[in-house]
A protein has these predicted regions:
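Mobile genetic element proteins and their domesticated derivatives, centered on retroelements
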Residues: 4, 63-64, 111-112, 131, ...
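RNase H catalytic domain
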Residues: 3-5, 10, 240-308, 315
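Catalytic palm subdomain of template-directed nucleic-acid polymerases
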Residues: 1-37, 68-75, 117, 262-278
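C-terminal reverse transcriptase regions that engage the nucleic-acid substrate
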Residues: 54-172
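Two-metal-ion RNase H-like nuclease active-site motif
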Residues: 176-190
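Acidic carboxylate-rich catalytic motifs and surrounding loops in phosphoryl-/glycosyl-chemistry enzymes
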Residues: 35-61, 65, 295-308, 312, ...
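Flexible, low-complexity interdomain linkers flanking nucleic-acid-processing modules
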Residues: 65-110, 313-373
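A short, polar/acidic, helix/strand-boundary loop motif
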Residues: 200-233, 262-280
Length: 373
């Protein structure tokens, strides 16, 4: 058995406690890995002890990441981040001239390092779908200026890496847990709708709906976007509604339910292999997760027959005559009678703003956006 790194985390109240834990730790290591006739080397590296790696400190470098034990944050080691930024910036500069390309081996190596770096920035994984597609194709040379989606992904990766030193990731943002809030969504060729409720945190039970624009409907019927793309856009709609309804989502746990299996898989991995449209939507969702400092979301599949609560708001636009609601008051009346809440509580209708609808529609139609949006 070979142990590469051993980490001891202590919350001491005195220096004596640190000495006690240090002695116990080193004794335990020698007991488990004693020097013998076969291997006379000491199990604890003298070289690393001289480098002070064995000293307790509030800040430590472990496996390429800097950990701050007081602030409970982590970030990529400065030298590694600087190297990645230098390479990525050189790629972007070369792409502006439209001449030089990136050797595939170099591209593959840097993307692997980026994937490791995004251990501390989980939302960064949502930017790598265009990179993953290029890795599958394995061209001898990668040209960013010929692939604007890939070029945009590299540019945003630079932004996340650059900001990570000024705003390190809180360790709590890396841990999944039981949801504080739950959102359920469904999308059809007519529109999208969903509900938001609180689980461990208080939240006004909310329902929302939105009819797709003529441009989106035309893109769907012409085959440029798929039903799964609409479902993915629906989850992005749902998230933006939750930002408004649930308040501060920093370090909160959120579960998102959908009856579309591909969408659930994409959100779980923050990546898609096939759909370029959904890759664009995942990128938008990932950036919103980063802006909000939310814990990893929990995407869950719900069977279509059990998702009747969101069938209504996603099909209120004439496809189902019995569900036709011309006003929010009609929707509220229908929802309260069909899905009554306990203690005579009432649902609330969230009116989507043009800002939110324009955001999602733009992303769905492959128009560009920024981190702040």
């Amino acid at each position: 058995v070979y142990v590469d790194d051993f980490v001891s985390l202590v919350i001491p109240t005195s220096r004596e406690q640190l000495r006690h834990v240090s002695t116990g730790t080193m004794t335990g290591i020698h007991d488990v890995f004693p020097a013998d006739d076969i291997d006379s080397n000491d199990p604890i590296s003298e070289k690393k002890l001289k480098q002070l790696d064995g000293e307790y400190a509030p800040t430590k470098t472990i496996l390429g990441f800097e950990f701050d034990g007081l602030a409970k944050t982590l970030w990529l080691e400065d030298a590694k981040r600087a190297h990645l930024l230098t390479v990525l910036h050189s790629w972007l500069r070369s792409s502006r001239t439209g001449k030089a390309g990136i050797p595939f081996k170099e591209f593959e190596s840097i993307i692997a390092k980026l994937r490791h770096a995004f251990t501390a920035i989980p939302a960064g994984r949502g930017l790598l779908s265009p990179c993953n597609k290029m890795l599958q194709m394995k061209p001898p040379v990668v040209y960013l200026h010929r692939n604007v989606v890939l070029q945009a992904a590299v540019a945003v990766c630079c932004t996340l890496l650059r900001e990570s030193s000024d705003a390190p990731t809180r360790c709590r943002e890396l841990v999944s847990g039981w949801p504080d809030y739950i959102g359920v969504c469904d999308a059809s060729s007519h529109g999208v709708g969903g509900v938001v409720v609180g689980e461990t945190e208080a939240c006004t039970p909310t329902v929302f709906r939105w009819e797709w624009s003529a441009e989106v409907k035309e893109a769907y019927h012409s085959g440029r976007i798929t039903n799964s793309d609409l479902e993915m856009a629906g989850l992005l709609f749902l998230w933006l509604v939750m930002e408004s309804v649930c308040g501060n989502l920093r370090e909160k746990h959120v579960a998102l339910f959908s009856d579309n299996s591909p969408t659930v898989s994409w959100v779980c991995r923050l990546a898609t292999r096939g759909s370029l449209v959904s890759a664009h939507l995942i990128r938008a969702l990932a950036l919103r997760l980063k802006v909000n400092g939310t814990c990893p979301i929990t995407p869950l599949h719900i069977a279509g027959e059990e998702n009747s609560m969101t069938d209504i708001p996603s099909r209120l636009f004439g496809s189902e005559p019995q569900w036709l609601c011309k006003t929010n008051h009609d929707l509220l009346t229908l929802f309260n009678s069909t899905f009554p809440l306990p203690n005579q509580s009432s649902w609330t209708v969230f009116q989507l703003s043009s800002k939110i609808s324009t955001r999602v529609t733009s992303v769905l139609l492959m128009k560009d956006f920024t981190l702040d949006e």
